[in-house]
């Protein structure tokens, strides 16, 4: 029952007569509907219902939602015309008329997901409906506000709804403040502040904020930075503006806008998108530029904010972060193929063929219940026409926590990322990226055929910006993806966000490259906390530069990556070197031999949580594609795990045939491994194959094998002890001055620049020197006293010399490989071979030790032993001889004692050749000749 009140404060709400406001308080209307339509022409954000009376004509009409409820999320699509409210008084102050019971009612949506459109109208040039553009779940397709607008009347203190088309700022204190419902965002204020920011921002403001004496940028402090950016966007025809959010903090007028961007990204980013278009038009008109304005009107500009605060850990995200802008860092594990994501659904009536377009609201299609034509109004007659719908490119990326964000004793968390349009395929598995996006949650159906939802919601990040470069890491070698770029015909800058090198940085790089001690300077800068090991550091330095990957038109591809193995005694800093290289490589994976399996290194089959389909997950070697894979405890690997490395280290591919998935994956990575000798102590009296538990075919695939031995030397031990104790007293080693070590940021920038821009070509003089050095290394095996020649070098050593020479020339920023580059490569190869391929019995280099595990002398001794066994068996009177008697007679004819294991090995070889027959087992074994041969 309605009660009439005489209180003046309730008169406006309960009175059955419409309220006519004071005409003097009406704010001025702007001629340009840049942000709003009037209430009579827009798709209003206020919906009501009145079944008791007809409304008079000539007033503004607002569409009504049937059965509207404050608890329902409406669709952003067009709604059917139902009952109409009367809008009286000044335009924009909307109040409902009284119902039959004398009580007025409001029917509105708590949160409508509308946002700003383009500066042109929602109609095309010919007056026809135009499909609106929309980025991700951020709507920019309507000139109405993203949410319902509220007027706050300062005179009465009463909140009233407002759909005014005025965009002018309030000029009097008595005028209402217009904000988006549910937020503190004023569209007009936000637009004005961001426009002033774009037109007036200078880098001196950021310099003051950061309190830095030097700002790394190619602009002066007084230059209008974003004016230059907008002009470059217009000239290049691009539509994306990367916005450093900290610049908003540096500009005093946009400090509040920075916090609004973090808390209400869906609304603020839409306003920024529209403001950029208005600024582009203003720049063209004000400067009288000869440019087609229609092209600006039809283009969809996007703001991509980043650097919105410190990066959060994935396990720190909570419900308070939903619908807010966040920063995340992680490792890309997997990315799906491109998915067509429906943005605008197209419906057609099966009765009258009337069509209508419906925008998707948070992944939900608000299907029309009946035809919107008044003459038809047929229920359940609208059907979806797929080929008339609008779709956008979408990709889902699996992001995992990096080790620095994982607490002790915890397993890494992962989260799903959704990227759209230009960000699709912007990163690959193995990339370390920093993303900026909106944290969202969506309900999950208990059954796909029912509408029952689970109480737990699924979360994901709607990405607006992706950054892949760290100042302390190298950039990805673009030569590894050259073939992919040629096939896709895209610019590599769109695929990889490489580090921006300024003119000042380039001048410093040239200055360092001109130093005479460049080679030793860069080598000292590699792991400066590790004492000495100069040759090891030089080899790793050349590995970071790498050779040049070559693909020939006649077929065939030659790798430019360099593989290095560190072998030696414990406590010789092998693992620390691996850790340092892993920290500065862009796509490196650090793993241990004992904790790795074959599928963990290559790829494995798993079932996707979302689609329930079998998918291929990348392993450590695939994730290191284009980087360096560091493997510690290489000798502890199982045989099945090591077998997969043979193809990777030479062909740089991984062949997979599992669960119906047959494919070949790229593994174009360098291998840096470390191994401990058998018994944890290297025995110099044994060859390298007997000291290291590695098969010879795998050992021969390493370009450089360094023996890091712990030798007793009083002078060296004293210097090493001083170095270690100084590390506990200061962060910088005592024997190295500040000028002798380059900062890690500059070192990575130098290497990245060389890998990106320097591709040396081998000259004729270098070619002649390579041939001469290779032939000279082969001649080292000549021995006039022996019929069989020792192999001291193979073609793999020649290819290794070519790669090292290219890396040395690339280090000096030279476009050609000269004689000195080849000489240094030959020196490194000979130094490494001298250590690990020397026969301890003869003191000579023998590559058979590395390739077959046996030297020429050992092979000759085994042949002589087999010949002696055959002679003993032929000279005996009986048909067979016991094994113990055979050992006794062999030792009688030999000057040196022959071990039973050597005799057993010789018998096994003779038995395989069907020359002898061994009967029995153990000490009862007997040996006789095979007379049938």
Curated annotation (Swiss-Prot):
**Mostly located where?**
nucleus
Q: Which reaction does it catalyse?
A: ATP + H2O = ADP + phosphate + H(+)
Task: Give the MCM domain ranges.
Answer: 518-725
Which Gene Ontology BP terms does the record give? DNA replication; DNA replication initiation; DNA strand elongation involved in DNA replication; double-strand break repair via break-induced replication; mitotic DNA replication initiation; nuclear DNA replication; pre-replicative complex assembly involved in nuclear cell cycle DNA replication; premeiotic DNA replication
Q: Which CDD domains match?
A: MCM4
Q: Kindly state which keywords UniProt assigns to this record, in alphabetical order.
A: ATP-binding, Cell cycle, DNA replication, DNA-binding, Helicase, Hydrolase, Nucleotide-binding, Nucleus, Phosphoprotein
Question: Where does the record place it?
Answer: Nucleus
The protein's gene is named MCM4
What EC designation does it have? 3.6.4.12
Annotated protein name in UniProt: DNA replication licensing factor MCM4
Q: Which InterPro entries match?
A: MCM, MCM_4, MCM_CS, MCM_dom, MCM_lid, MCM_N, MCM_OB, NA-bd_OB-fold
This molecule's function is given as: Acts as a component of the MCM2-7 complex (MCM complex) which is the putative replicative helicase essential for 'once per cell cycle' DNA replication initiation and elongation in eukaryotic cells. The active ATPase sites in the MCM2-7 ring are formed through the interaction surfaces of two neighboring subunits such that a critical structure of a conserved arginine finger motif is provided in trans relative to the ATP-binding site of the Walker A box of the adjacent subunit. The six ATPase active sites, however, are likely to contribute differentially to the complex helicase activity.
- Sorted alphabetically, which PROSITE patterns does this protein's record hold? MCM_1 (PS00847), MCM_2 (PS50051)
Q: Where does ATP bind?
A: 568-575
Misc note? Present with 8800 molecules/cell in log phase SD medium. Early fractionation of eukaryotic MCM proteins yielded a variety of dimeric, trimeric and tetrameric complexes with unclear biological significance. Specifically a MCM467 subcomplex is shown to have in vitro helicase activity which is inhibited by the MCM2 subunit. The MCM2-7 hexamer is the proposed physiological active complex.
Name the residue ranges of motif: Arginine finger.
Answer: 700-703
Skewed-composition ranges (Low complexity)? 27-42, 86-103, 164-173
Does this entry carry the keyword Hydrolase?
A: yes
Which organism does this sequence originate in?
Saccharomyces cerevisiae (strain ATCC 204508 / S288c)
Its GO CC terms are:
CMG complex; cytoplasm; DNA replication preinitiation complex; MCM complex; MCM core complex; nuclear pre-replicative complex; nuclear replication fork; nucleoplasm
Species lineage, top-down? Eukaryota, Fungi, Dikarya, Ascomycota, Saccharomycotina
Q: Name one Pfam family in it.
A: MCM_OB
Region entry Disordered: which residue ranges?
A: 1-149, 154-173
């Amino acid at each position: 029952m309605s009660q009439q009140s005489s209180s003046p404060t309730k008169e406006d709400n309960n009175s059955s007569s419409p309220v006519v406001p004071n005409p003097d308080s009406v704010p001025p209307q702007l001629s340009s509907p840049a942000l709003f339509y009037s209430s009579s022409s827009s798709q209003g954000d206020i919906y009501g219902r009145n079944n008791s009376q007809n409304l008079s004509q000539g007033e503004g009409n607002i569409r009504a939602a049937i059965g509207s409820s404050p608890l329902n999320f409406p669709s952003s699509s067009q709604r059917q015309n139902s009952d109409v409210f009367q809008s009286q008084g000044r335009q924009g102050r909307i109040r409902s008329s009284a119902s039959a019971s004398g009580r007025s009612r409001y029917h509105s949506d708590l949160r409508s997901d509308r946002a700003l459109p383009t500066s042109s109208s929602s109609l095309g040039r010919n007056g026809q409906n135009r499909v609106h553009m929309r980025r991700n779940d951020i709507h920019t397709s309507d000139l109405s506000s993203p949410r319902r607008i509220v007027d706050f009347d300062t005179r009465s203190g009463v909140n009233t709804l407002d759909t005014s088309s005025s965009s002018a700022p309030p000029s009097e204190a008595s005028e209402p403040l217009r904000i988006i419902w549910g937020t503190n965002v004023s569209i007009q204020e936000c637009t004005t502040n961001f426009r002033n920011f774009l037109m007036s921002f200078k880098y001196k403001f950021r310099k003051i904020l950061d309190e830095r004496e030097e700002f790394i940028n190619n602009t002066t402090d007084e230059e209008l930075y974003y004016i230059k950016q907008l002009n470059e966007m217009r000239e290049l025809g691009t539509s994306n503006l990367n916005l450093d959010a900290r610049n908003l903090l540096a500009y005093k007028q946009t400090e509040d806008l920075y916090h609004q961007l973090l808390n209400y990204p869906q609304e603020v980013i839409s306003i920024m998108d529209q403001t950029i278009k208005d600024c582009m038009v203003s720049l063209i008109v004000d400067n009288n530029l000869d440019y087609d304005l229609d092209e600006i009107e039809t283009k969809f500009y996007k703001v991509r904010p980043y650097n919105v605060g410190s990066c959060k850990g994935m396990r720190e995200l909570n419900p308070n972060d939903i619908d807010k802008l966040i920063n995340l860092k992680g490792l890309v594990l997997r990315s799906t193929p491109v998915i067509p994501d429906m943005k605008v659904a197209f419906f057609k009536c099966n009765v009258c063929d009337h069509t209508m377009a419906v925008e998707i609201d948070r992944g939900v299609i608000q299907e029309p219940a009946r035809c919107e034509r008044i003459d038809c109004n047929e229920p359940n007659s609208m059907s979806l026409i797929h080929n008339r719908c609008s779709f956008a490119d979408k990709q889902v990326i699996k992001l995992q926590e990096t080790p620095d964000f994982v607490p002790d004793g915890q397993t890494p968390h992962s989260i799903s990322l959704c990227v759209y349009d230009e960000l699709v395929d912007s990163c690959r598995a193995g990339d370390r990226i920093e993303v900026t996006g909106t944290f969202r949650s969506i309900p999950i159906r208990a059954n796909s055929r029912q509408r029952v939802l689970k109480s737990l919601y699924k979360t994901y990040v709607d990405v607006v910006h992706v950054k892949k470069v760290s100042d302390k890491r190298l950039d990805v070698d673009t030569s590894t993806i050259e073939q992919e770029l040629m096939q896709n015909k895209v610019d590599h800058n769109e695929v990889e966000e490489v580090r921006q090198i300024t003119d000042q940085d380039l001048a410093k790089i040239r200055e360092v490259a001109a130093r005479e001690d460049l080679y030793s300077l860069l080598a000292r800068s590699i792991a400066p906390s590790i004492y000495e090991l100069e040759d090891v550091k030089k080899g790793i330095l050349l590995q970071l530069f790498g050779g040049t990957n070559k693909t020939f038109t006649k077929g065939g591809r030659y790798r430019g990556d360099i593989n290095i193995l560190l072998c030696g005694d414990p406590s010789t800093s092998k693992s620390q070197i691996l850790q340092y290289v892993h920290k500065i490589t862009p796509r490196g994976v650090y793993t241990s031999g004992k904790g790795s399996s074959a599928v963990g290194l290559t790829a494995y089959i798993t079932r996707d949580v979302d689609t329930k389909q079998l998918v291929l997950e990348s392993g450590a070697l695939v994730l290191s594609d284009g980087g360096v894979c560091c493997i510690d405890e290489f000798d502890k690997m199982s045989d099945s795990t090591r077998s997969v490395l043979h193809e990777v280290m030479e062909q740089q591919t991984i062949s997979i045939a599992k669960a119906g998935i047959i494919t070949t994956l790229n593994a174009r990575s360098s291998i840096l491994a470390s191994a401990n000798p058998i018994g944890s102590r290297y025995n110099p009296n044994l060859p390298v194959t007997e000291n290291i538990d590695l098969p010879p075919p795998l050992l021969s695939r390493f370009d450089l094998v360094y023996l890091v031995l712990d030798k007793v030397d009083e002078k060296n031990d004293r210097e090493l002890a001083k170095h270690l104790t100084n590390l506990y007293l200061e962060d910088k080693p005592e024997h190295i001055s500040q000028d002798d070590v380059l900062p890690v940021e500059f070192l990575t920038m130098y290497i990245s620049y060389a890998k990106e821009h320097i591709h040396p070509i081998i000259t004729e003089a270098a070619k002649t020197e390579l041939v001469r050095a290779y032939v000279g290394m082969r001649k080292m095996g000549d021995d006039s006293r022996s019929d069989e020649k020792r192999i001291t070098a193979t073609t793999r050593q020649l290819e290794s010399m070519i790669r090292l020479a290219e890396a040395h020339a690339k280090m000096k920023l030279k476009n050609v490989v000269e004689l000195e580059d080849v000489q240094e490569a030959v020196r490194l190869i000979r130094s490494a071979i001298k250590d690990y391929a020397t026969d301890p019995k003869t003191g000579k280099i023998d590559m058979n030790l590395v390739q077959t595990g046996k030297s020429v002398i050992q092979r000759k001794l085994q042949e002589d032993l087999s010949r002696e066994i055959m002679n003993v068996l032929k000279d005996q009177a009986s048909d067979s001889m016991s094994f113990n008697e055979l050992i006794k007679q062999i030792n009688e004819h030999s000057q040196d004692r022959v071990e039973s294991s050597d005799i057993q090995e010789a018998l096994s070889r003779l038995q395989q050749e069907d020359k002898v027959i061994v009967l029995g087992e153990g000490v009862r074994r007997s040996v006789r000749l095979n007379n049938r041969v």
